[in-house]
């Protein structure tokens, strides 16, 4: 067929739709047919005809209907069909129903006249010689009557419409006698039914039991090749109807298996498409059907078989010589198709049979890359790990029917040669196989066959003779005979699911099933496939074995007639293939399906590997307890339930010691009803109200709990792994245990092997369709794959690295190499080439919120940065149409796989992706996407995504507090627990794969961003996967606000890695090739999240209760929460995956709707209860977690730390714990600045080094990586500690600022991530000092690395952030790595690596791609002491946004620690709310705080936005974190989220600045383009690190940048206490200098994103603010009064005011409504500002219009919504004129500036061209915006939100 560039898939669909269109007008149909004929037939005909002039045959063709005669030269060796095509091509007039014209040989020499069979060769019809030119007639096929004389009139009477209809009726009812009578009377059966277009024969061929009818018709003159109106022959119809009997009958009657339909496709081709019993396929092949027929898109049969997963058809095709390397029009081989559509079994067969996995499609993508892009990480892993030694080619020769003349093109003897491509053991002498002795051939038969042979000697021997080649005799069939044969695996080819057919010679006359004789083996089965008997079978003859339902069957070989040989219950023999079904066994090795396998299937989100590690009871200490919970009406039970979602009990689930039930507590609110009753995060629910729920789905369990009202009796099992200590170690993730630090997987602290196992398990889980959400990524993958096709770069799998640690760039590269992932040039953030560099901006922000956990944990800060923009983009993508649905991101709410062992589980919701990535399986934000659109994703895809994503996510989550937060409000404790138990995947690769599969969701592996996994629409044509829009699952980050600020941050973080993808998606040319496909996935996820968020925003209950649930809904938070949570259950440290496992299934749905805060989050009052839960969760994160070090850290002090990410208790000696303790000390002693030096060393390493991405991080980051490994744990501990502290602080120090010690990640430039530390007010002062010192030191040296480590730890970098302060304990080293990480741990919430890192990054890490702060930073809050409270505050803040003031009160009231909560918001300051993030302006992403911040906003899910905001805030926070500590600073991201930054991160701006320039260039390219172009609209996109502002962004967003970043008054907490304040001031001044430098740099001014970012970073703390103030007037600071519900925005307030505000800020409620912000900030904050030492702040934030910025915070009710709402972002703090004017007075330029401020500068021109001024804005409707080119939902939402804020203001 002509190959068209159109997607094969589409073409295919088209073709089939055409097939069904029988009613097409005849004329058009004829034309189509003619075209097809010319295309299909002319080619072979012409070619053959001209083969040799000497070998041609001239025939006179008489065309009676046209009254023409032509002499045509034919090739006698071509088929009659070809000759016919030649004739058709010469016609000058068209004939009706031309396909049914045929060459008729008139009667002559005593021969009857007959039509030449179209598939026979012309020379088989000898022409009379000596009579001149032979003559043939070309005429319509009619019955050829034998009678000499015909009564034409009588015949005419017979052929009336009535009679013809009657004839069809008879056929329909199989009235053979009546049919025969009619035919005997002379009826011509070659006619079309006018209604259906069927012919009698085609109708009969589709009927059951129609053998006699078919025979009667044939005898009555029916032509076997007479085509129905749709162009298909009876044979095609029988094949499509899977009618074996009719097919066999037709073949026996002489029909050719190669008849072509109107598209030139054969029946064999159709069988590959329709699937079903492979017997039809076998029959056709046995009858010499030609293989390698291709459609107009170049798809061969094997492509179709792989596309639809018809494994047995595929294997038969391969056995009969199909070309495994055949490429379709896109250059995709069958293996590419498998990779794209996640057809695991088909891929196994191809690889097992010798398929070339190195062949690239026309996008230069290998199957491995396609799989990554499609988010099918398990499959990618399998492809990558397949070795040539695993290849077992067919050693048997195919059997053919001896009755039929062997067509020239069938595979006769040559076939062996054909097969050589898959048979590496083929002998050159293979052709003599035909002469092979029977004895030899017998060797390929099973003993049973041999025994049976005598019974049917002719059949067996006959077929054997033609079927078994000598060389092939060593076939695996020997396995059967000799045991293992050559291929040890062969004996257990578990995957054959089809039914082979007895192809024996007897088949000619007998149906396979009628064939009682010995079964003949065709070929050995592919090992590694698992089959289970689905129906019983009793042996009918010797050699067969009985099967019982449920038997596990090992298939050894495929036999003829649908019989397979295999072993069951110890018996080996034959059985019908239809009796068994394949079950996915993810494990690469062919092992029987084990309980672990099943669990993997069940919990795609969690890596079975991790689960397996604790498979044995010996690993787990099971503690069962029954608790009775009694709650009040207005509150919840205080826990968030997570688990597999299923409408009916999942019977396949086999409880294991590590994962005893499907539902488990993702988080438990400390101090809540559940907590007091002794429930802890990770507890598995065995019974609810005395009903067993071990296998019950999430929704059902939630309903059971609800039905109980206020009374609940739970029987739970606490699984404590003996590995728990290891878990802590894990947290430390000793240097990647079995990996170079490079792998950074060690963060998971799991062995690489176990990680791989997890990957596999995860894949297998994903395969299950239990968890649509989780599988989401899988859904998305197609799209991603398609995108991939378009963007070869998409294949850049760099994101795959999922290591929690951020290894040096070189390490990362090695990881990539290990993974076979193309290493994007710059894994190093500084490297402009880094594919993610461009992405960083958006991604970081997003990462901050959602991917913070995952990203930081799995991705290096740097990587994260790279990813950030794409995340951002994805965030914007979110605005895109429901791509997220297309790409169901991994359920954000995916329950943590029960075994939290692999933190990546949470981190790897991917997907999806992916997931991220067949619908788009790459939706990686499992948490976010799943939550967002759990239902959207197909179960399978979701499951796959889940599986993948979960695994990674868990990994990431473990590292990221966000994951915990994501999980639930209770996530706080859980997060701690989880963090504590966070395990860095030791196998970064596996993690990468997993995470990639949830690419969108995979913050842990930025390189692998699922976002990129957006379906590879480019790669393949899968129409269903056309959604190439990166729908960043980043939306998951939104959920970050849910369960706890932390959670939401985690979500954000998770999303962030994907964010980078979105940019690529947004801009195919983006540097991040992979990003695009992943972007789609991410975008889908993001969008999904946005929707969910919107729903949540719209639902107060969701706001509060669903914050936890929202974690689900918000996807990102959930994963974070979940991962953290699960790890929090110390017992499940390794069971993180388990946690995820169960969590993903239910959580997927639950995450959004199902992730209920049983603790009343859902039950509790929509706003307050939920928020308290959230805050509690944050505060409780540590407490809540059973092993919550938070509580312990609070109580036990530095000694007891909970890993911030995993929520596990940290080993006191672990770097994280050290960091935490150091941080504690630092917080208490403000003199730890010197630590910076050690960090300096690390400085070169990107803070969040994508372990996979960052090769250059090897030096310092290896350490960091290790530390990070522990870091997340450490961080969790810190988090826990902080939560505990926070609890304390909240109680006692409500106003304490969370000093987000964002040590200058910029110092760590490469890390590009700021250390954000939260410190109590008291600690704050000390911490500030320390931080300041540190910041200075770090900024200069590796302090940033230490920060990075924190971030790293957190998500991979967030921990490091904390680490900077942490270094107090370990002055040099700590900061650099452990110390830093430990300190970083302080960041209870993942502090997304802020742009800060970019400041220092300049040198090492050109912030060309100023990455948004690592997700951890972005989304997490550094709340060492108040961390819990602060985190909740964040979440509360988000909620507040959502519910407005009520939420804030909730925050405040929720926890005495709410003060801490406030601090948390202060930390949030770290993650400035989008609106407050001038940086967002600087980089679109900022505005688009989350990947789809805009979308989030657009969904008007402010909470989501908060998440996004968090991420943005994190970025800013990171920036300002170093600059100062705004204890109560509430940072609002451009996305409109306000976060209290208890202690603004010390702004390591200086670093950022230089980096910014570099970054800018890079960013400008990738990020700016992507962000601006694609994500500009969603201002809420997480801002990349300040320094990471992209130049392009700067241009596009410059106004915005100045407004959002530079102009925005810095959000600082004036309440910098003493030394801290001083330190902050110092940092501030440094930052200012840096900023000035940056600003000084052309295009880097306030307008320039980096400039803005710098400012943004600097403004972190009031003092820093003042310092920065001089440097940057563009930063926005806002204080949140504890009492106020909205963060206070400090626009361009005077430094005094700023200071006052800072001071006030401390007190202000975490979130102040924009209005309140304006009021309070202006009045009270003014006084507060005085307290703040940075009067210059206003200068820094010389955004006079900052007050609107307050609104910008979106803190007003609308703005406060959970998701980073665009509304907040929309009023970016800007110095543009529009900020001082009422909207209706805005001019067109004002509108353009305003759009810029929203990071939507890409739409400026359209608005200008359409002369849209302020008076038009309020009236713009959705349709108007679409007409204006604002097609992204997120962008529209951002605009609408911003407008609403403007109008409400």
Curated annotation (Swiss-Prot):
Pfam families: Ank_2 (PF12796), FERM_f0 (PF16511), PDZ_6 (PF17820), SAM_1 (PF00536), SH3_2 (PF07653)
Biological process according to GO: adult behavior; learning; long-term synaptic depression; long-term synaptic potentiation; negative regulation of hippo signaling; positive regulation of cell population proliferation; social behavior; synapse assembly
Positions annotated as glycosylated: 1667
Modified residues (Phosphothreonine): 860, 1278
Annotated spans, Disordered: 1-33, 451-493, 764-808, 878-910, 1013-1293, 1328-1371, 1432-1526, 1574-1594, 1678-1776
Residue windows of the ANK repeats: 196-226, 230-259, 263-293, 297-326, 330-359, 363-393
Domain PDZ positions: 626-720
SH3 domain location: 526-585
Low complexity bias: start-end ranges: 15-25, 1040-1052, 1159-1170, 1181-1199, 1208-1221, 1343-1357, 1506-1522, 1721-1738, 1760-1774
Record field: compositional bias (Polar residues): 1445-1460, 1678-1692
Phosphoserine, modified sites: 831, 960, 1099, 1709, 1713
A GO term from the CC aspect: growth cone
Entry comment describing in which tissues the protein is expressed: Isoform 3 is present in epithelial colonic cells (at protein level).
Residue spans of biased composition, Pro residues class: 887-903, 1577-1588
Biased composition (Basic and acidic residues): 764-774, 1086-1097, 1274-1293, 1494-1505
Residue stretches of biased makeup (Acidic residues): 1128-1138
Record note on domains: The PDZ domain is required for interaction with GRID2, PLCB3, CFTR and SLC9A3.
Subunit and interaction comment: Is part of a complex with DLG4/PSD-95 and DLGAP1/GKAP. Interacts with CTTN/cortactin SH3 domain, DLGAP1/GKAP and alpha-latrotoxin receptor 1. Interacts with DNM2, DBNL, GRID2, BAIAP2, SLC9A3, PLCB3 and CFTR. Interacts (via proline-rich region) with PDE4D. Interacts with ABI1 (via SH3 domain).
Role according to the record: Seems to be an adapter protein in the postsynaptic density (PSD) of excitatory synapses that interconnects receptors of the postsynaptic membrane including NMDA-type and metabotropic glutamate receptors, and the actin-based cytoskeleton. May play a role in the structural and functional organization of the dendritic spine and synaptic junction.
Name of the protein this chain belongs to: SH3 and multiple ankyrin repeat domains protein 2
